[in-house]
């Protein structure tokens, strides 16, 4: 049900905020713009700057309102008037980050706005002291037991207010944050859900709730308000849960209803494509976003990750210099510079910049993960483990941190730990072949060969990014003396390489041709064996074996040895490789395609 214009400010500024009536759909974009402008002001008054910026950016993407439709500021209550002087002074102190001073002058204030700023100042004071302690004991890697000492007191006071039903939407949001910081996750989720019902326009509450949801099943059981804000929340959580197809559909719907100029939505779409490793699409969107919003810093660390993967040194260098000119002390800027140095193999400098990012914001997920990668490059496994663990503390859905831990314990030759972490990464990214190949290698080391085979085949079935799954599966069949299955895997590997037009010159291609040459030779299929042996001659490591096999085939033919008719060939070479243009047949799936470990 759409809300009338007059209802919105009254609902928000009521003494004890009731459920806020806002639009349930996007049928009235003018009304939505009014609501966004209103909440941008209310969050700014309370020092919730990120929520204010998000609302303002979204409002800016909608058509401007005529003067007659612009809303006046919300009416001032009697309590607001009594606390006005204290609030004005305290807000000035708050804005320059003198949180204790702000809290001191707000003590005893009764208005909702002043009370929130009082409690929020105390919370941020505790966070600042904790972060200072963290930096002093450095590195961010020795964060250890440093806690925000204000949390327990804040919880007690906010709990009393909550039980008395005296918290408005902002108060509920802060109570939820305190509960989350105390690791009271279930209670925090309940409070954040309540906050979204009381004040659906506050993006910060939705975002905090998003950070606590671990899977789609958990999402289904949440009782969320039926408002247009829910669509933004669902698009965001789908992206976080790696449900990229659903996320992209949601964002496309938001563009279609009128938010096509939103830089937030465009950036989220780019992040979604980054998450599914559609690098070209993601790069294209980020480049377009940079043209529209050249001074934007948000998500530029993700953009730099894409440039890093593509080894685009000059573009990454330009991005790093550009962001330095805009704001060298932003966490995203530090991460971009870190990526630049990492691409140049200057890993100590890269780690230093990731540490700088963490001094600015110890809860910045990307910096922890990237620093873990750098410590891995420097062979400092203990520091890498700590960095990845901190990343998981910040966000348990970060598959890169779980995967990094798996790699670290693999280096330490601790396969059971390795298996646990790779499993967690696979749960978060079930269709990522890298996780499946890593799992397969782990099972192989633990001599659980059946499970290893399942993983390798599944990795191939979901789309093998690194084109190694079939080779590893073939070698496993070799180890088990399952020659026919090994040959099937190698021929499919060769077919895949040549069908997609890749020019691959590495050890595994030569390994495949060598095995196939020997396999066909044993089967007395001279034409196929000869073709594969000739291919072996193109590689340094198999050239001599290829020549020797060709000599043997020639000798046997000269002796009148005829090809066998008794041993059936399970498949044939691609027509482009076969001397006699034998047609190809699709490889049997080994009955493993539907099985996951």
Swiss-Prot record:
Stretches forming TPR repeats: 27-63, 73-112, 114-144, 169-200, 229-259, 263-293, 297-327, 331-361, 366-395, 400-432, 433-466, 468-500, 504-540
Keyword tags: Acetylation, Cell cycle, Cell division, Isopeptide bond, Mitosis, Phosphoprotein, Repeat, TPR repeat, Ubl conjugation, Ubl conjugation pathway
Keyword Phosphoprotein: yes
InterPro entries registered for this protein in UniProt: APC8, TPR-like_helical_dom_sf, TPR_rpt
Residues with PTM Phosphotyrosine: 273
Top-level taxonomic group: Eukaryota
Entry keyword annotation includes Metal-binding: no
Modified sites of kind N-acetylalanine: 2
Outcome of substituting residue 374 to A: Inhibits APC/FZR1 E3 ubiquitin-protein ligase complex activity
Molecular function terms from GO: ubiquitin-protein transferase activity
Record pathway: Protein modification; protein ubiquitination
Residues modified to Phosphothreonine: 562, 565, 582, 596
Reported modifications of this chain: Phosphorylated. Phosphorylation on Thr-562 occurs specifically during mitosis.
Positions carrying Phosphoserine: 578, 588, 593
Transmembrane segments annotated in the record for this chain: none
Cross-link (Glycyl lysine isopeptide (Lys-Gly) (interchain with G-Cter in SUMO2)): 147
One GO biological process term: metaphase/anaphase transition of mitotic cell cycle
SMART domains assigned to the protein according to its UniProt record, in alphabetical order: TPR
Modified residues (N6-acetyllysine): 467
One GO location term (cellular component): nucleoplasm
Family: Belongs to the APC8/CDC23 family.
Function noted in UniProt: Component of the anaphase promoting complex/cyclosome (APC/C), a cell cycle-regulated E3 ubiquitin ligase that controls progression through mitosis and the G1 phase of the cell cycle. The APC/C complex acts by mediating ubiquitination and subsequent degradation of target proteins: it mainly mediates the formation of 'Lys-11'-linked polyubiquitin chains and, to a lower extent, the formation of 'Lys-48'- and 'Lys-63'-linked polyubiquitin chains. The APC/C complex catalyzes assembly of branched 'Lys-11'-/'Lys-48'-linked branched ubiquitin chains on target proteins.
Subunit structure: The mammalian APC/C is composed at least of 14 distinct subunits ANAPC1, ANAPC2, CDC27/APC3, ANAPC4, ANAPC5, CDC16/APC6, ANAPC7, CDC23/APC8, ANAPC10, ANAPC11, CDC26/APC12, ANAPC13, ANAPC15 and ANAPC16 that assemble into a complex of at least 19 chains with a combined molecular mass of around 1.2 MDa; APC/C interacts with FZR1 and FBXO5. Interacts with FBXO43; the interaction is direct.
Protein name: Cell division cycle protein 23 homolog
Organism whose genome encodes this protein: Homo sapiens (Human)
């Amino acid at each position: 049900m759409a809300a009338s214009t007059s209802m919105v400010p009254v609902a928000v500024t009521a003494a004890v905020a009731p459920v806020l009536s806002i639009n349930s759909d996007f049928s009235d974009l003018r009304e939505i713009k009014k609501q966004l402008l209103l909440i941008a002001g209310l969050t700014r008054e309370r020092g919730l700057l990120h929520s204010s910026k998000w609302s303002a950016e979204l409002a800016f993407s909608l058509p401007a309102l005529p003067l007659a439709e612009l809303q006046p500021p919300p009416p001032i209550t009697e309590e607001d008037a009594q606390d006005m002087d204290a609030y004005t002074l305290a807000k000035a102190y708050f804005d320059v980050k003198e949180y204790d001073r702000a809290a001191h002058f707000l003590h005893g204030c009764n208005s909702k706005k002043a009370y929130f700023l009082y409690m929020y100042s105390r919370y941020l004071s505790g966070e600042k002291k904790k972060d200072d302690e963290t930096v002093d004991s450095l590195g961010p890697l020795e964060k250890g037991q440093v806690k925000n000492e204000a949390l327990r007191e804040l919880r007690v006071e906010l709990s009393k207010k909550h039980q008395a039903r005296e918290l408005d939407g902002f108060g509920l949001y802060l109570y939820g944050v305190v509960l989350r910081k105390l690791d009271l996750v279930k209670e925090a989720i309940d409070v954040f859900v309540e906050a979204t019902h009381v004040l659906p326009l506050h993006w910060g509450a939705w975002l905090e709730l998003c950070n606590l949801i671990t899977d789609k099943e958990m999402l289904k059981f949440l009782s969320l308000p039926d408002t247009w804000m829910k669509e933004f929340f669902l698009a965001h959580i789908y992206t976080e849960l790696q449900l990229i197809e659903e996320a992209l559909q949601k964002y496309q719907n938001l563009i279609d209803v009128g938010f096509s100029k939103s830089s937030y939505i465009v950036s989220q779409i780019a992040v979604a494509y980054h998450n599914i490793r559609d690098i070209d699409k993601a790069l294209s969107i980020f480049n377009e976003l940079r043209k529209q919003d050249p001074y934007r810093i948000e998500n530029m660390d993700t953009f730099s990750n894409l440039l890093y993967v593509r080894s685009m040194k000059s573009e990454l260098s330009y991005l790093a210099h550009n962001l330095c000119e805009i704001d060298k002390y932003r966490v995203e800027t530090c991460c971009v510079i870190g990526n630049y140095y990492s691409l140049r193999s200057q890993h100590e400098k890269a780690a230093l910049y990731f540490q700088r990012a963490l001094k600015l914001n110890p809860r910045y997920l990307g910096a922890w993960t990237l620093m873990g990668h750098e410590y891995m490059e420097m062979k400092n496994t203990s520091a890498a483990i700590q960095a990845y663990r901190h990343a998981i503390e910040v966000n348990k859905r970060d598959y890169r941190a779980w995967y990094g831990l798996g790699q670290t314990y693999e280096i330490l030759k601790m396969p059971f730990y390795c298996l646990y972490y790779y499993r967690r990464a696979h749960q978060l990214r079930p269709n990522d072949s890298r996780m499946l190949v890593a799992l397969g290698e782990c099972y192989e080391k633990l001599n659980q060969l059946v499970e290893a085979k399942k993983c390798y085949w599944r990795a191939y079935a979901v789309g093998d990014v690194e084109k190694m799954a079939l080779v590893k599966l073939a070698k496993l069949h070799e180890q088990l003396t399952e020659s026919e299955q090994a040959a099937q895997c190698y021929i499919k590997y060769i077919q895949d390489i040549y069908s997609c037009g890749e020019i691959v010159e590495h050890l595994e291609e030569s390994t495949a041709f060598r095995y196939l040459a020997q396999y066909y030779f044993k089967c007395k299929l001279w034409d196929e064996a000869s073709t594969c042996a000739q291919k072996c001659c193109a590689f340094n490591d198999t050239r001599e074996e290829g020549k020797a096999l060709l000599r043997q085939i020639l000798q046997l033919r000269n002796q009148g040895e005829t090809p066998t008719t008794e041993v059936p060939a399970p498949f044939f070479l691609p027509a482009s490789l076969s001397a006699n243009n034998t047609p190809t047949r699709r490889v049997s799936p080994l009955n493993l395609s539907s099985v996951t470990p």
